[in-house]
Swiss-Prot record:
Part of a tripartite efflux system composed of MdtA, MdtB and MdtC. MdtB forms a heteromultimer with MdtC. It comes from Photorhabdus laumondii subsp. laumondii (strain DSM 15139 / CIP 105565 / TT01). One of its GO terms (molecular function) is xenobiotic transmembrane transporter activity. It is found in: Cell inner membrane. Pfam families: ACR_tran. The chain crosses the membrane at residues 15-37, 345-362, 366-388, 395-417, 437-459, 472-494, 535-557, 867-889, 909-931, 968-990, 1000-1022. This is Multidrug resistance protein MdtB.
Length: 1048
């Protein structure tokens, strides 16, 4: 420092202005921490907001939906339903499969939930069927969450069973070991097995029955401990040829002796190598394949995980035979990378536009350099805090930083503009920096804390929406806080060191022209401002009308939940008649796939038929359609889906439901459409009455399309009605009848072959190729007590009935779920109201309850909290401003700017054809924080002028408006241009970003036009009100008390 008397002023910035080295190193530390944090942050599409979800799957081949419900699902549900922290339990019981999906509270750690699930399964194990071939298996993955990577393994030369075996032993295990992989599942299950197909006539001719053969196979194939021999000097382990491992071994197996001659298994059956389940299949572009689905661990870095898998793929492919081909079908990180890249570009564009605006207003290249350093520094420093908070680089955090570009530059602009004003008045840069920074310090603190206060309610939002925007709010708040620190430290220090005195600044023609332009703008504003101040009630009336208009527009605008994204992936469900066979369903699926592949926007299609954890019934097929990249197709996904559905509509007997896959997954089940509504009753009989009635009513509603229900009660059932008296007289038990039927038609798993690498099942069934349909029952024979073979038909009749294909439970009670999409000209709010009206119109009994599910339930919760959220933001800001200004009145003046922003935002959304969704609401809340800064800058200077210069309120606010016009215009333009790239975005994930940009731009334009006039008018009106109250209180205090009045 130079010798001499110290220059006064500087406020909180003084120390940093006078110590440039310390300030520079402090900023370098922030920069370094931010860079390190950025390199360590994971990358994802959205913040980690998934509900802890666990799926319990139990397979019991051959069991009917009724048996699965009563014998498997119900015992498990009774135990699982007792767990603490359980939010919802839903189940599907279909032919041979029970799937229970458990959704826990967001606050419950998944590991804790896993332990409770395992304990509940153990508790229920004694109640499950003894011949259950597989124990219940649970997985810590949401079944509705799409895989991050899908691979298809195909071959023209090898059977699918061999491919499945190779995939299980060579590929799936290796991929499972990659860090970040949560679960690897195989679709199209063709696990190798030995299939024993009994010839019913040959079995009967030998006087045998299927149960005798099953017992013989079981006894012939064992793999158990045999002990060891211990001698004086050595020990010998015992082994034997107790296992039969090849098809030939089973063909030659002696199952009985007749007339002294052996009866071998090949004499009464066909034994072949085949698939464990012949009613499962997956196809990639109509080529049968084993599809590998890779799902992530919660919180894993999706891009890093996928990259690690891709790096090991060449090695995995080289380990396969040349006739086997493995390719990537879908890679979700492709769209995640593209989306994040687009947002990063928009962030850089926002920074460039903001810097351009600063130069345009300051007309000084060196002065422009200061915020050009301050803005990136504030944003980069935020990454360090994001890392310590466990956040990720995702669309929302990058959107927060993009919006923050306009926010963080505000502080720098306010400081630079105020210091520049003193330099233009002839002060030296050091003196100007100390005076300007000291004068503006309180304003910066007011702007910062009032803006952060707006974000506080977002942190207290409950449920999944609150979790989703917590990262957004904290990232934005941290960026704003770091910006305030930079603006009070680095910015004034750089102004003092690099700005030149006014006498040394030479402006070029452009800078001179822009200076004259702004002077003319200020002069024009002064004229209109005087008119507004001279006609206060007209201006005040305009301000009040914006409040009424905001309320009216809020009631009018269509409301939605979350923008539908175009991620290039379409999830489809193909529904066929309930009695369709597996073979017929495969043919239909292939026909649909061939038709869809002809569409120019489709890149590949993966299809699946069969019953597993995600597909409950045989008449439902699953499709996943991968579209070409956005830049290689002409249409967006919302236009492609109707086109594909229209093509398939020409195929008779099937219905195709399609929906775009989303980054945000709230549902716990794979559904036909985007939205669900559930009926819950005490019995299936009640549902059978009211489900068709409600379905018919819903189809009358114009707001709804693609309406369907998972209620399927028209499946064909062959009901075996046994005459128990005759059966008892012949010595045939019901257990023997069930076993005979199961052996014949259940693909019964009767034994296991153990090898060093895997385990393979022995499947028993009847060969029914020559006796299709109900005629197959004619060949069922049972052994009576006298040794005679008894045909099933002599003790039972076969009746054909209709029954449920699947039985669904919600919270252990029977339920039916309706799926629907929203019509093109309707909003989600209108669709929800239409569903609710339809349910009320049919007058269902009180014991039938209704409930929206998944996305629709989250929408209702978010919609109900919208007004409370906005009110909380306003109240939080009022409290902070009241504390800062020590006034009840001035915060009201500042908050009077808010309705103008609301009108602008809602009008912009309506003009752009967008719904008021969660993203748009966040935009409105951010506007609340932005637009009040105009009033803060005006009122701060007006109060200072009244206090320090002795000006009247009129003169003070008039002078403040003119002095602050340039920084107000600069900060508004900076915030507007920061949001402009979001509003104009067209790349991957643009649907998510655009509503936020539209709200910000519309609200800023409207508020900028009106608040420049309404704020000073309201300031004066409140000042007159305060003056009137003071005078009245003074007159009351001067009036003598009655007790002291002298008597007349």
């Amino acid at each position: 420092m130079q010798a001499g008397s110290p220059i006064p002023g500087g406020g909180p910035s003084r120390l940093f202005i006078l110590r440039p080295v310390a300030t520079t190193l402090f900023m370098a530390a922030i920069l370094l921490a931010g860079i390190i944090g950025y390199r360590m942050l994971p990358v994802s599409a959205l913040p980690e907001v998934d509900y802890p979800t666990i799926q319990v799957v139990t397979l019991y081949p051959g069991a009917s939906p009724d048996v699965m419900t009563s014998a498997v699902t119900a015992p498990l549900e009774r135990q699982l339903g007792q767990m603490s922290g359980l939010k919802q339990m839903a189940s599907q019981s279909s032919g041979g499969a029970s799937v229970i999906t458990l959704q826990f509270q967001l606050t419950l750690p998944l590991d804790v939930a896993e332990q409770e699930v395992q304990a509940a399964i153990n508790a229920a194990s004694n109640l499950l069927p003894n011949d259950l071939p597989y124990p219940p298996i649970y997985s810590k993955v949401n079944p509705a969450d799409p895989p991050i990577l899908m691979l298809a393994v195909t071959s023209d030369a090898m059977p699918m069973t061999q491919i499945q075996d190779m995939v299980e032993t060579r590929i799936a295990q290796k991929i499972s070991q990659v860090n970040g992989v949560g679960l690897v599942t195989l679709a199209g299950g063709q696990r190798p097995a030995v299939r024993v197909k009994l010839n019913a006539q040959a079995v009967a001719a030998q006087g045998l029955d299927s149960e005798t053969i099953r017992t013989a196979i079981n006894n012939a194939n064992v793999n158990s401990a045999k002990g060891s021999l211990d001698g004086p000097t050595r020990s010998v382990t015992l082994s034997a040829n107790d296992q039969m491992k090849s098809v030939n071994d089973y063909r030659n197996l002696i199952i009985a002796y007749k007339n002294g001659s052996p009866v071998r298994l090949q004499d009464v059956a066909t034994i072949e190598q085949g698939a464990e389940n012949t009613k499962l299949g997956a196809w990639s572009n109509n080529t049968q394949a084993i599809v590998i689905n890779v799902q992530r661990q919660p919180g894993a870095n999706v891009i890093e995980t996928t990259d690690n898998i891709r790096q090991m793929l060449p090695e995995l492919i080289s380990s396969l035979p040349k006739s086997v081909d493995m390719k990537i079908l879908t890679d979700r990180t492709t769209t995640i990378r593209a989306s994040v890249k687009d947002v990063q570009f928009e962030l850089l564009l926002a920074i460039a536009l903001v810097v351009m605006v600063i130069y345009l207003f300051l007309r000084n290249g060196i002065a422009t350099l200061i915020p050009s350093i301050a803005v990136p520094l504030s944003l980069i420093g935020t990454f360090a805090v994001m890392y310590f908070c466990g956040f990720s680089v995702n669309n929302l955090t990058l959107m927060a930083l993009t919006i923050a570009t306009g926010f963080v530059v505000d502080d720098a602009i306010v400081v630079i503009e105020n210091i520049s004003r003193y330099i233009e008045q002839g002060e030296k840069p050091m003196t100007a920096a100390l005076k300007g920074a000291g004068e503006i310090g309180f304003t910066i603190i007011s702007l910062t804390f009032s803006l952060i206060a707006v974000l506080i309610p977002l942190l207290f939002m409950g449920d999944i929406v609150g979790r989703l925007f917590r990262e957004f709010a904290i990232t934005l708040a941290v960026a704003i806080l770091i910006s305030a620190v930079v603006s009070l430290t680095l910015t004034p220090m750089m102004c003092a060191r690099i700005l030149k005195p006014e006498s040394q600044i030479k402006h070029n023609r452009f800078e001179q022209a822009s200076g004259r332009f702004f002077e003319q703008m200020i002069a024009g504003y002064a004229v209109w401002l005087k008119r507004a101040l001279n006609h206060p009630w007209i201006t005040f009336g305009i301000a009040l009308s914006t409040l009424a208009l905001t309320a009216l527009l809020y009631l009018m605008i269509p409301k939605g939940f979350f923008p539908s994204q175009d991620n290039g992936l379409i999830q489809g469900t193909l529904e066929a008649p309930q009695s369709i066979s597996f073979t017929a369903m495969v043919n239909k699926q292939q026909q649909v796939s061939s038709l869809l592949l002809q569409d120019p926007a489709v890149e590949n299609i993966t299809t699946f038929v069969g019953v597993d954890g995600s597909n409950p019934t045989l008449n439902n097929g699953r499709l996943q359609i991968t579209l070409k990249p956005l830049n290689q197709r002409d249409d967006r996904i919302v236009d492609i889906i109707p086109r594909l559905q229209e093509k398939v509509a020409a195929i008779p007997g099937i219905k195709l439901y399609l929906q775009p896959m989303q980054d945000l997954t709230i549902d716990t089940q794979v559904t036909r459409t985007q939205y669900q509504f559930t009926l819950q009753a005490t019995s299936l009989d009640e549902l059978s009455i009211w489900v068709p009635k409600l379905l018919a009513e819903l189809k009358q509603r114009a707001e709804l399309v693609d309406i369907s229900s998972d209620w399927q009660d028209q499946g064909l059932i062959a009901y075996v009605k046994v005459d128990r008296d005759i059966a008892s007289r012949l010595g045939i038990s019901m257990a023997a009848i069930d076993n005979a039927l199961y052996n014949a038609f259940g693909q019964r798993l009767i034994s296991t072959i153990y090898t060093q690498a895997n385990q393979y099942r022995i499947i028993l069934e009847h060969d029914v190729t020559s006796t299709p349909g109900l005629a197959a029952f004619d060949n069922i024979r049972l052994n009576g007590t006298d040794g005679h073979v008894v045909p099933l038909r002599t003790i039972a009749t076969i009746e054909q009935k209709f029954g449920p294909l699947a039985i669904n439970h919600l919270a252990q009670f029977p339920s039916a779920t309706f799926s629907f999409n929203v019509a093109e000209d309707a909003s989600l709010e209108q669709a929800v109201n239409a569903v609710r009206d339809a349910a009320q119109l049919i007058n269902m009994p009180k014991d039938i309850s209704t409930q929206f599910q998944g996305t629709t339930l989250a929408f209702e919760s978010a919609l109900g909290n919208t007004l409370w959220l906005i009110a909380a933001a306003i109240i939080a800001m009022y409290i902070v401003l009241g504390i800062l200004y020590e006034s009840f009145i001035h915060p009201v003046t500042i908050l009077s700017t808010l309705p103008t922003a609301g009108v602008g935002a809602l009008l912009a959304l309506m003009m752009a054809g967008h719904e008021l969704d969660v993203i748009a609401i966040i935009g409105i809340i951010l506007l609340i924080g932005i637009v009040k800064k105009n009033a803060i800058m005006m009122i701060d200077f007006a109060l200072a002028a009244e206090r320090e210069q002795g000006l009247s309120p009129y003169e003070a606010i008039y002078q403040a408006c003119l002095l602050r016009f340039r920084p107000i215009l600069m900060t508004t333009m900076a915030a507007l241009l920061g949001a402009l790239p979001l509003m104009l975005s067209t790349g991957v994930g643009a649907e998510l970003r655009r509503p936020l940009g539209i709200c910000m731009v519309g609200g800023l334009i409207m508020s900028q036009i009106l608040t420049l006039f309404t704020t000073p008018v309201i300031y004066l009106l409140f000042d007159r009100l305060a003056h009137y109250r003071r005078n009245r209180q003074l007159s009351v205090s001067n009036t003598p008390s009655i007790d002291h009045q002298e008597p007349r």
